[in-house]
Amino acid sequence: MESSDITAEIRMAVLGEWVPPQLADLLALQRAEEPETHAVLAGWTDPGRGAEMPDDGFDFALSAVARQWAGWVCEPLWHDTLAVAMAKRSHLLAYREVPCQEVLKQSVICSQSTTHESWRMTVQRVFDDVLHEREQAVETFDVAMTLVGAGYGIAIAPAARLASYLHRGVAVRPLAGAPTIVMAYLLRRNASLSDTQARFARRARLVS
């Protein structure tokens, strides 16, 4: 593979339907510290094919799912905590942190598009796998949040992922006792990085 020091370009594939907000901070840091090296993003939305690579034309990939690609390393990159999304008129707003037992009294809306994301498994562990009984599945996260805003139920997801829906009739509270979760993974080749690539990876790890 040609060194990105020669091409002065970092190519990153962004996998899945959601882009972590930290990516904007990473790109801004890259521009400020190394403006001569351009970061080129390529979106790729197909969460159902977690074991496959979209193509071979990139240096890094950013994913909400831990992926196993031959010849690549997948490392946890950015972390978050679980939160509860609810309608702005919900009685759950009385809680500073929503207790798990209150969640189990509600209809919980989840999206099929996030099924393979690691935080979904964490949610089930927190509730000892009994949450399935209360879940209503819809196709996408956007549809799930639309129903939440309309008062049809609540949703559980990383706090940063819910933040962008606050202007759509949705309120957010932390989930009481929730563990820290991995929100995004960085994938890179299992080989020596060029100096340019190594600096980009270091900046990615510095962003929180």
Which positions does each model-derived feature cover?
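Secondary-structure junction motif
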Residues: 23, 106-130, 193-197, 201
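Flexible hinge/capping segments at coil-to-helix
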Residues: 72-82, 86-108, 198
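Central regulatory/effector-binding core of bacterial HTH transcription factors
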Residues: 7-68
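Short helix-loop hinge/linker segments at domain boundaries
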Residues: 1-13, 32, 70-73, 94, ...
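A late-sequence structural motif
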Residues: 10, 22-25, 171-208
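Short, well-ordered beta-strand segments
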Residues: 9-15, 61, 85, 109, ...
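Hydrophobic hinge/microswitch elements
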Residues: 45-50, 54-57, 64, 114-171
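Beta-alpha-beta core module
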Residues: 70-76, 80, 142-192
